[in-house]
């Protein structure tokens, strides 16, 4: 009976677990895993191939080699199951136990585990508070360590050399205890009292003030507490028993010719066993100390190599000079256990083949070769054959399929019907890289792919291959059909625009059929409808392009969503009328009544989806494709050499440019311009010439002159094939046509600099040898770049996925009122992105009011769809506060309202959607399109940088924000604030343009004044920074002593003299401490106060400042007192493209970041040191001033006595995101990162929705540093998960206690991935050893919240359809129900019964 119970217990699967804990293994635990001790280094007998007894492959310890058969062959078959053979001692069971049964080795001397010793920071070193060097010297038998000092003057843990030890031994005898080797370290660890040590350290922490000491102490406290809380014992970091991996995980395979292939682990284990046995023997023989010591050291090294080869000293190599793969190497890296077997697996029921076009397929179909289908669906076919009674057994069915009998094909047809397959093209950069289709059987061996899904797969038909997978279970088929079918993935998850968009031939065909032509056959007819138009065209009575009137019936949706017909006569062409026949009801005719290019077609599909929904759009897309292909064939568009028309003016333009270049060369030789200026000018001249040539060429291609019906000449858009292809967006661009028929233009060298001699020829004329060489020179760089780019982009995607993988939508509404203000993106005079594009699909965080009133336009918590956005535009709303994932209050995951619309589906996001992964893919996927190049500012760009005025483009009124200004003597405004913005507002109050205005700019128009388009509203000198007085009065020089602090210089050309302030380095000793300044006094000589303060108006002058006033002159407010020359910013490289995106997400500090004000207050300068200035900010409220040392060469934007706000820029430069977070808060840093990333993508014309970047930013902000612990259990300065602090504070506040105060941290994506709560996820990402060591010591629990952890433990992921499963488990656990018990299968039951009966027959209880 006992056996029966045992059997039933063993049948229940123990799959139900909620978390995984990692901890140190105690020696007893290792013994409890083990099935026996491995005593011999032998593996298998090379003659009989049987495993040696007690060896590394011993059958007695690890289990039988053959199923249900003992080694000597006494017991065979199932009936002896569970018997232990008395001859060979092997249990009769399945051979797969050799994969799970472990053994152990009893070590003769303890050895340290290398991970806890050498993985930095060394855990053993930190725990004992001893330097790693010393511990290593003890472990590897170079010195002694004192364990008990006794009554002597020796300290515990003191290190003694051999001589010192012998001296001490003579002096004290056995009063004290000192040892060497791992035993000594073990004894030290064993005798530690962790709790008392903790108390002591906490006391020290409260007493000490030094920063470094505090850091060290907190580290130790954290480690000690981890040991106390996890129940790990410190001495377990020293191994006394070594576990042995099951033999089938370190196989030994006989090759032919009597050789063996073996896993490296066997070699490493053999060395350990050999040395261990030798040591045992030496100890038994009581060998001399020095020999034993050497053997112990060698054992330590052998164990080190087994655990992590190469971490200490040289790696042990095999016979072929390659380092052996240790246990640590088995789990880390791309080929390790995590990434090779747990996160990525090979799958059954899959095949791959080349793809070709399937233009006749429907959108949801793919062509599957019969051969492949037969192989993939074999089990289904066998099942069907048996079900029909066509085959009696599976074996017979197999035979039938092999013979390929006729009936098999009919059955294959049945099986395949309604059974979707998945198609995948590597690299799978986003979720549209795997889609489901219904297979259609075809002859041939290539998979046929629908042309419209090529864009999503990024596939072309030049030999690409794709893989097919068969979803087997019913659930999988359901998901494939409902979620992954290509017809359900019409919109791109990255930006919510259609991704199923016709391209190339289809676009050309539609463009051709919707073009109009002057005086075509049949012009001026009036037709009864599209049907008649098609009849006339087919019968050759009317041309496709003829301008005609057609009666068109449009359908419009009324308020109830019913379709209402409306008929009218339209001016159109025959082709457009024919195209109208396939447009679904409900769309306006205006949508096809134009020459349709790629953009127009995309817009048409988008409109169709938004108005009519999914099904009509899919049918429409298919119809568009068939029509496009048909008319592209009809058009007969082809490219001949005569289509490349070279403009006549080309030679004239080129000779003019050459003359200009010659002139500049002369100026250079006569020394009037520098080499750099000459180079820049030459490049400008050629760039301008190139533009002129290409303009002439395009004008030439674009139009042709024809005779119209009245016999007059008329210009019309040309039907030149090359022009049509470019104009429609089918293929090619103006730049490419320019190279064909204009001039090739300027070429770049591989380092990105431009070669100043352009290629004046084009491809039609042909290149000479020199030109050909120049053009290959730069082109090769492009190819090398592409290869690098792909790898880099893939790595960026991997890091992004890793940081965001556990972010899932977990609730509907977190109830927060927080959000971010959305305004249109305006750069200079252009609206780069209008407000509607930014808020579309977001949820409002607060009521949006009608501008100028208190009426609510859009209530809070409204999902802004297209209609709402139209309403916002009509009311010219300028800024909307929307919910954002960055400010979402959900603890684990985010809520649906903060995320908004699911871009790929068009409704609010569902719970369980894995938004983190979607965001990562959306940002990573276009990565390959970004440039790798970091571009230098060269040529035209550098002159544009030195702007000196603002000229507005539109008319409107001026609005200045954060501005301080004074009026000068001529009544103009002079700006005296730092980050002033000038906006142009149109009559509806919408911002049209926005400019930055520098300090000292003179405004022509004031705040709120009207300006006309093209008017200049502000001027300034770009090369100097003025010092402007805010008061009127008389100038009084202070500390300005000629020769000491200033020097007089006279300009040679004008003869005017000016004073120049000396740098402190140039001053004499007496002038070092003087501070030259200009004071403003009134006529009586009293100080004038700055208005609104009680500070006298005096302006301190920095070094190099130029003063053109004399002492005692009268000045008025707004005048320039002095000018500080600005060294031009040099050519700082702008990092662009992919590296810039990576820098932003890694939150790297820029080289010379902008210096921001840490607190608000008044600026003054303290005592200078040799190379630095001391900046002091004194708060107005009288709290402590803040000091900072700033290098002298940094240019400051502030003067003495100026008031700054916290977060203001003190010295220009690229801003460091950490500073923005610290000084301006979470929303500011979000805005900064989002805008910077978008700038890079916008340059490449890639559209990504802001919320994807916000999702990544949320993950970068997931840690917080504790500033003050309050009544919580956190340590001051500890970095913890933000959600944990929030939860802890909520509980504390509920109990009326003080919560912890914290500051948010910004981590780069790599750091953030490694700092996740889940150690499984972190270990599978990077630095596996370090992560696992840390986790084991702390005894971490992995709650399996993220996606990766669940994939690794082999569960459904808690997202998508798996979300419900996980919710259900949590609910059941909360209710305390038992998980559904797995049913025992019939065969298992019969087998176990047989086993029980056998055991009963054997009569002996082999326990």
From Swiss-Prot:
EC identifiers of the protein: 2.7.7.6
Q: List the Gene Ontology MF annotations in alphabetical order.
A: DNA binding; DNA-directed RNA polymerase activity; magnesium ion binding; zinc ion binding
Question: Does the keyword field hold Nucleus?
Answer: no
Biological process annotations from GO: DNA-templated transcription
Q: What does this protein do?
A: DNA-dependent RNA polymerase catalyzes the transcription of DNA into RNA using the four ribonucleoside triphosphates as substrates.
Q: Which positions bear N6-acetyllysine?
A: 972
Task: List ligand-binding residues for Zn(2+) 2.
Answer: 814, 888, 895, 898
What the record says about family reads: Belongs to the RNA polymerase beta' chain family.
Q: What interactions and quaternary structure are annotated? A: The RNAP catalytic core consists of 2 alpha, 1 beta, 1 beta' and 1 omega subunit. When a sigma factor is associated with the core the holoenzyme is formed, which can initiate transcription.
Q: Which cofactor does it need?
A: Mg(2+); Zn(2+)
User: What keywords appear on the UniProt entry?
Assistant: Acetylation, DNA-directed RNA polymerase, Magnesium, Metal-binding, Nucleotidyltransferase, Transcription, Transferase, Zinc
- What high-level taxonomic lineage is stated for the organism? Bacteria, Pseudomonadati, Pseudomonadota, Gammaproteobacteria, Enterobacterales
Q: Which species does the entry assign this protein to?
A: Shigella boydii serotype 18 (strain CDC 3083-94 / BS512)
A single Gene Ontology CC annotation of this entry is:
DNA-directed RNA polymerase complex
Summarize where Mg(2+) binds, as residue positions: 460, 462, 464
UniProt: Zn(2+) 1 binding residues:
70, 72, 85, 88
The record's section on InterPro entries has: DNA-dir_RpoC_beta_prime (IPR045867), DNA-dir_RpoC_beta_prime_bact (IPR012754), RNA_pol_asu (IPR000722), RNA_pol_N (IPR006592), RNA_pol_Rpb1_1 (IPR007080), RNA_pol_Rpb1_3 (IPR007066), RNA_pol_Rpb1_3_sf (IPR042102), RNA_pol_Rpb1_4 (IPR007083)
Gene behind this chain? rpoC
User: Could you tell me what reaction this enzyme catalyses?
Assistant: RNA(n) + a ribonucleoside 5'-triphosphate = RNA(n+1) + diphosphate
Indicate what this protein is called per its UniProt record.
Answer: DNA-directed RNA polymerase subunit beta'
What's the record's note on cofactor binding? Binds 1 Mg(2+) ion per subunit.
């Amino acid at each position: 009976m006992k056996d029966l119970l045992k059997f039933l217990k063993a049948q229940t699967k123990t799959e139900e677990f909620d978390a995984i804990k990692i901890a140190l293994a105690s020696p007893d635990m290792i013994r409890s895993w083990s099935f026996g001790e491995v005593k011999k280094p032998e593996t298998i007998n090379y003659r009989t191939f049987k495993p040696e007894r007690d060896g590394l492959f011993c059958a007695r310890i690890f289990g039988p080699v053959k199923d249900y058969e003992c080694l000597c062959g006494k017991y065979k078959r199932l009936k002896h199951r569970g018997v232990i053979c008395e001859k060979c001692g092997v249990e009769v069971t399945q051979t797969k136990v050799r994969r799970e049964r472990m053994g152990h080795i009893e070590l003769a001397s303890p050895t340290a585990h290398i991970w806890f010793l050498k993985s930095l920071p060394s855990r053993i070193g930190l725990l004992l508070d001893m330097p790693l060097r010393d511990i290593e010297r003890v472990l590897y038998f170079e010195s002694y360590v004192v364990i008990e000092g006794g009554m002597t003057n020796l300290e515990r843990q003191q290190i003694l050399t051999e001589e010192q030890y012998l001296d001490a031994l003579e002096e004290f005898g056995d009063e004290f205890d000192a040892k060497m080797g791992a035993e000594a370290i073990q004894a030290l660890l064993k005798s530690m009292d962790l709790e008392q040590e903790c108390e002591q350290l906490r006391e020290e922490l409260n007493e000490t003030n030094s920063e470094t000491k505090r850091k060290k102490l907190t580290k130790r406290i954290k480690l000690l507490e981890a040991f106390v809380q996890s129940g790990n014992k410190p001495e377990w970091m020293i191994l006394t028993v070594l576990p042995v991996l099951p033999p089938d995980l370190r196989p030994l395979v006989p090759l032919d010719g009597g050789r063996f292939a073996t896993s490296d682990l066997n070699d490493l284990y053999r060395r350990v066993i050999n040395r261990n046995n030798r040591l045992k023997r030496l100890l038994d023989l009581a060998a001399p100390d020095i020999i034993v010591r050497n053997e112990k050291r060698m054992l330590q090294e052998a164990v080190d190599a087994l655990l992590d080869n190469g971490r200490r000293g040289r790696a042990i190599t095999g016979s072929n000079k390659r380092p052996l793969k240790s246990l640590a190497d088995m789990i880390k890296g791309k080929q390790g256990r995590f990434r090779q077997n747990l996160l990525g697996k090979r799958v059954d029921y899959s095949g791959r083949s080349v793809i070709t076009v399937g233009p006749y397929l429907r959108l949801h179909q793919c062509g599957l070769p019969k051969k492949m289908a037969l192989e993939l669906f074999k089990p289904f076919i066998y099942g069907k054959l048996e079900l029909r009674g066509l085959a009696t057994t599976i074996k017979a069915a197999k035979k039938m399929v092999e013979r390929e009998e006729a009936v098999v094909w009919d059955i294959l047809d049945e099986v395949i019907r309604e059974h979707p397959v998945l198609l995948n093209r590597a690299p799978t950069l986003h979720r549209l890289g795997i889609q489901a289709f219904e297979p259609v059987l075809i002859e041939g061996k290539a998979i046929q792919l629908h042309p419209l899904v090529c864009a999503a797969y990024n596939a072309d038909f030049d030999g690409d291959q794709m893989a097919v997978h068969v979803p087997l279970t019913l659930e999988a088929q359901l998901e494939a059909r409902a979620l992954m079918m290509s017809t359900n993935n019409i919109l791109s998850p990255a930006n919510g625009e259609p991704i199923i968009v016709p391209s190339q031939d289809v676009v050309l065909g539609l463009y051709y059929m919707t073009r109009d032509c002057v005086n075509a056959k049949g012009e001026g007819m009036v037709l009864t409808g599209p049907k008649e138009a098609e009849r006339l065209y087919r019968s050759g009575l009317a041309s496709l392009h003829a301008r005609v009137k057609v009666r068109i019936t449009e359908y419009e949706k009324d308020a109830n969503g019913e379709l209402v017909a409306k008929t009218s006569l339209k001016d159109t062409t025959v082709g457009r009328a024919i195209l109208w026949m396939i447009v679904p009801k409900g769309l306006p005719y205006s949508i096809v009544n134009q020459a349709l290019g790629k953009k127009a077609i995309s817009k048409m599909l988008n409109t169709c989806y938004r108005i009519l929904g999914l099904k009509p759009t899919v049918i429409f897309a298919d119809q568009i494709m068939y029509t496009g292909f048909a008319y592209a064939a009809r058009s007969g568009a082809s490219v001949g050499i005569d289509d490349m028309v070279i403009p006549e003016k080309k030679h004239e333009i080129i000779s003019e440019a050459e003359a200009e270049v010659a002139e500049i060369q002369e100026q250079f030789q006569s020394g009037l311009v520098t080499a750099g200026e000459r180079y820049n000018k030459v490049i400008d001249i050629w760039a301008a010439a190139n533009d002129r040539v290409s303009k002439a060429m395009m004008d030439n291609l674009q139009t042709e002159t024809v005779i119209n019906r009245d016999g007059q000449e008329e210009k019309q858009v040309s039907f030149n094939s090359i022009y049509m292809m470019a104009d429609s967006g089918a293929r090619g661009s103006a730049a490419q046509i320019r190279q064909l028929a204009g001039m090739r233009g300027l070429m770049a060298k591989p380092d990105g600099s431009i070669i100043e001699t352009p290629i004046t020829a084009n491809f039609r004329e042909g290149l000479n040898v020199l030109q050909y060489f120049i053009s290959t020179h730069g082109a090769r760089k492009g190819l090398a770049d592409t290869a690098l780019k792909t790898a880099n982009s893939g790595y960026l995607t991997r890091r992004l996925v890793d940081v965001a993988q556990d972010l899932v939508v977990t609730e509907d509404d977190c109830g927060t009122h927080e959000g971010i203000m959305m305004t249109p993106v305006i750069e200079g005079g252009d609206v780069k992105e209008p407000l509607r594009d930014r808020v579309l699909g977001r949820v409002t965080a607060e009521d949006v009011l009608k501008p100028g009133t208190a009426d609510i336009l859009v209530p809070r918590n409204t999902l802004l769809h297209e209609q709402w956005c139209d309403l916002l535009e009509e009311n010219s709303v300028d800024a909307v506060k929307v919910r954002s994932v960055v400010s979402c209050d959900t603890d684990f995951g985010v809520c649906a309202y903060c995320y908004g619309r699911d871009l790929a589906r068009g409704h609010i996001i569902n719970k369980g959607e894995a938004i983190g992964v979607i965001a990562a893919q959306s940002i990573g996927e276009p990565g390959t399109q970004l440039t790798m190049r970091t571009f230098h500012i060269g040529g035209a760009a550098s002159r544009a940088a030195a702007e000196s005025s603002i000229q507005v483009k539109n008319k409107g009124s001026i609005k200045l924000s954060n501005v301080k200004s004074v009026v000068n003597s001529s009544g103009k405004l002079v700006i005296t604030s730092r980050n002033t913005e000038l906006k142009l507002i149109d009559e509806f109050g919408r911002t049209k343009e926005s400019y930055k205005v520098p300090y000292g700019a003179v405004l022509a128009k004031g705040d709120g004044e009207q300006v006309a388009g093209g008017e200049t509203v502000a001027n300034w000198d770009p090369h100097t920074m003025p010092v402007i007085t805010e008061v009127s009065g008389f100038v009084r020089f202070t500390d300005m002593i000629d020769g000491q602090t200033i020097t007089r210089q006279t300009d040679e050309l004008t003869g005017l003299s000016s004073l120049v302030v000396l740098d402190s380095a140039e001053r004499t000793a007496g002038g070092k401490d003087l501070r030259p300044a200009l004071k403003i006094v009134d006529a009586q000589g009293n100080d004038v106060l700055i208005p609104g303060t009680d500070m006298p108006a005096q302006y301190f002058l920095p070094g190099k400042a130029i003063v053109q006033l004399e002492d005692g002159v009268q000045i008025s407010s707004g005048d320039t007192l002095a000018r500080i020359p600005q060294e031009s910013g040099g050519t700082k490289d702008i990092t662009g493209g992919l590296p810039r995106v990576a820098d932003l997400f890694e939150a790297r500090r820029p080289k010379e970041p902008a210096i921001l004000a840490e607190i608000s207050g008044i600026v003054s300068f303290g005592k200078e040191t040799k190379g630095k200035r001391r900046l002091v900010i004194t708060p107005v409220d009288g709290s402590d001033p803040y000091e900072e040392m700033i290098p002298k060469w940094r240019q400051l934007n502030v003067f003495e006595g100026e008031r700054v706000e916290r977060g203001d820029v003190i010295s220009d430069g690229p801003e460091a995101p950490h500073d923005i977070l610290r000084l301006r808060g979470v929303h500011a840093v979000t805005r900064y990162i989002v805008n910077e990333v978008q700038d890079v993508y916008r340059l490449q014309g890639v559209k990504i929705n802001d919320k994807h970047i916000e999702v990544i930013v949320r993950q970068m902000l997931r840690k917080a540093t504790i500033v003050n612990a309050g009544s919580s259990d956190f340590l001051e300065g500890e970095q913890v998960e933000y959600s944990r602090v929030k939860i802890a504070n909520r509980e504390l506040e509920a109990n009326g206690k003080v919560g912890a105060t914290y500051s948010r941290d910004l981590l780069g994506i790599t750091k953030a991935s490694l700092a996740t709560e889940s150690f499984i996820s972190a270990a599978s990402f990077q630095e596996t050893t370090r992560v696992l060591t840390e986790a084991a010591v702390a005894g971490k629990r992995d709650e399996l919240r993220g996606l990766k952890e669940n994939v690794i433990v082999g569960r459904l992921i808690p997202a998508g359809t798996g979300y419900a499963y996980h919710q259900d488990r949590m609910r059941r656990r909360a209710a305390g129900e038992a998980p559904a018990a797995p049913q025992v299968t019939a065969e298992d039951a019969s087998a176990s019964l047989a086993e029980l009966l056998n055991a009963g027959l054997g009569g002996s209880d082999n326990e």
